[in-house]
């Protein structure tokens, strides 16, 4: 049972006639009703119409005719929805949030981005921080600058785990072991403080609640699941919004307010819930919540890149809602893994989901694709054909026969607006991750023969990376860890498991040597990574299958790609594999993101 006399910091007392809330219930900004052009503007809610309580003449005639006068009178007097509507009037939100949430009408400029330093101004030194990262797009939202700070007590929380794993067994047991070793090998961070959860599926929520301390801050990028997590906690532990003054004093709620938490918890939650939206940067100020006997702070999301593309610009708003609304994710893809087949062509045949990206396999390759991105997929003869079709869709106002496949706006109408990336050569499967969009699994089939590099074309400003298939990687690593009684690492140390891609010129024909050249330019001062610069990369990739001693020993994907110095100085790297990596010249995400 909650200690009701404990901190309800900031829930204002109110009556049905006077609204005294001072913050938007959705974005937590201070409300004002004087200047519509300034942030926080809202219109005062109107009272319920008298007609709700006093039926008009036509209503009375109908009631007389149906002989339900007495029943209708009782229904009006005891209508539980009437009280709900009155109470929801008290959940005041600003005009900006009202237009965005209820009418899907918003200007992205009214949702400004914040930097990490901006957000950390809200967090006192030495505070407990939960770094929220969506596991489904790991590692693109993982910020080592947060995890490495000495002035914060940071725990890594991986949300949306139900979009990666079939059940919570792996989430509760296997992920923490894997992440402990991943952080140690990759970031030199020795930490046991990792949780994988699913707020929608209620996976590990009780464990998470028992772990987090009083006065904890939730920190992460926009739309990573902070507000959804808070709402799950509020429902499970009967939590509510609070306000803390400058002295740290907690203002207790009125008995009337708290009584409703027990008499009508559903309505109580509607009033107290955090604002959840597919729109990024909705939260503009810190909002505190009382969850059981603990205070939890929801911080605004922050962005790590000033050149990041706002997805509202190129992507159709209906498609964007499907991408961002976690509850619409179809988990049957996790269980069934239904794939689509595609063969590479000499014309540059491509695979796309809405025009958001174009995947171009090399000529003659046979590929299987498992899509974890909402929306129908389509193949085209080449990228130019795809762009031409989608341009026609945008100009036809929805009458084009292929309009259902178009997920981009008319602003993306030329091939030059896409960046071309080369994917390192691989045997088996990889997952291609697009930040804030999702991921696809790409698998090559048949006998290995190097036919060229896979390519992916993406609108400029969208981050992309590849990884070994995450579920299989963690499952096999855990099995190895258990069988050896912890002597073998759950996270591979003989190879990086995530990689960045290389941008190519649109007209570049020799992509493999272009990758090598680019790598050498970026590692000019890294002598250990340039020991085999004179070897021909084509000779290597043509005979990968013959080098079984150096490739097939690598479990799962066997990425035959990466050529950077070992992740850590004590990594036990097979010399043949190490030599192969250095010859091919592929740069890793670890080097690009994690190393300063």
UniProtKB/Swiss-Prot annotation:
Sequence ranges assigned to domain CP-type G in this UniProt record: 113-305
Pfam families registered for this protein in UniProt: MMR_HSR1 (PF01926)
Gene responsible for this protein: GEP3
Highest taxon listed in the record's lineage: Eukaryota
Transit peptide: 1-21
Principal location listed in the UniProt entry: mitochondrion
CDD domains from the UniProt entry: YqeH
PANTHER family membership: GENETIC INTERACTOR OF PROHIBITINS 3, MITOCHONDRIAL
InterPro entries in the cross-refs: G_CP_dom (IPR030378), GTP-bd (IPR006073), Mito_lipid_metab_GTPase (IPR050896), P-loop_NTPase (IPR027417)
Function of the protein: Interacts genetically with prohibitins and thus may be involved in the mitochondrial lipid metabolism.
Official protein name in the record: Genetic interactor of prohibitins 3, mitochondrial
GO MF term (any one): GTP binding
Any one GO CC term of the record: mitochondrion
Keywords of the record: Mitochondrion, Transit peptide
Record flagged with keyword Metal-binding: no
Family per record: Belongs to the TRAFAC class YlqF/YawG GTPase family. GEP3 subfamily.
Cell compartment(s), UniProt: Mitochondrion
Annotated organism of origin: Saccharomyces cerevisiae (strain AWRI796) (Baker's yeast)
